[in-house]
Amino acid sequence: MRSFDMKYSVLMPVYRKENPFYFYRAALSMMKQSVSPDEFVLVCDGPLTEELDAVIRKLEETWSEQVKIVRLPENRGIGPALAAGVESCRNNLIARMDSDDIACPERCEKQLVQFRGNPALALASGAIAEFEMDSLEKAANMQWTIDTPKELVEIPEDCCITGTRTLPCGYEEILIFARKRNPMNHMAVMMRRDAVLSVGNYRAVKGAEDYELWVRMLQAGYRAENLPDVLVYARTGNGMMQRRGGLAYAKENIRLQTHFYKSGFLTFPEYISNCAVRVAASILPVGIRGYLYQKKLRERMHA
């Protein structure tokens, strides 16, 4: 572990349907960062399974001074869960992490350097590598127990990378990009707690809690940057393409774009264009939608 003059909190929500093996790998990847976190806030979004609670007990036993558990009595969704987590963090810098992804070992160190170099920075993320289950998970997932040596669950060694999602790095480019798409990779975000709270924290915006928050922060004049480096291995599969389609998904997208337009973030032509693109993508068959998504990722990988 390397020492650093800036402290940060990790914020990770978890709910009962999470795979305990994935959860443990995700948590270890953050606790074993090259610059270790001062605090690890786990928000339990409603009652969990015994297997997930066993992982939490193991984390508390190993890192009793850092791990802080916030338990919500019922499942409220990721927006309210993250809002509760932000309020519970004791440090101003917060590293967001999903409960089924794997952070690169120097992710947080790179972001701390980024924040130290730009005192005006309030929001930052980086590239993500989307991956499928590696051989370790295929071999161990079914028989894994909480007593599996943690060295075996830290880093994906031969995972199948299906694509890399890169984003514009500079503030001006992010402002332009945000008018069409989410400008940050949520699972790789580091943010300033005071800035997030000043614009009202996370809200219950189904499927876009992060994007809606970023837009409010950008509208308030907060600075954002992205690193070109891959910071997180993000897990794909598990019905991702199905969740990104259908009439309900199209309606949610239109509702979000309408909100952006009414708030003054989008012009009317941008609003119409965004809605048309999202509706068209939502009604495509799953296979075609998945093909186009992977094609776009491959183009990014070789750009």
Language-model features: where?
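Cell-envelope/extracellular polymer assembly enzymes that use nucleotide-activated donors
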Residues: 7-11, 29, 39, 212
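Conserved nucleotide-sugar donor-binding catalytic segment
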Residues: 10-13, 149-163, 168-248
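Short, well-formed alpha-helical segments that are part of the catalytic scaffolds
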Residues: 17-32
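Acidic donor-binding segment of Leloir-type glycosyltransferases
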Residues: 28-71
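Glycine-rich, basic loop-to-helix element that forms the pyrophosphate-binding segment
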Residues: 72-89, 110
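Short aromatic/hydrophobic "clamp" motif used to bind/position activated sugar donors
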Residues: 94
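The conserved acidic donor/metal-binding loop of glycosyltransferases
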Residues: 98-102, 127
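Conserved donor NDP-sugar-binding/catalytic core segment of glycosyltransferases
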Residues: 106-162
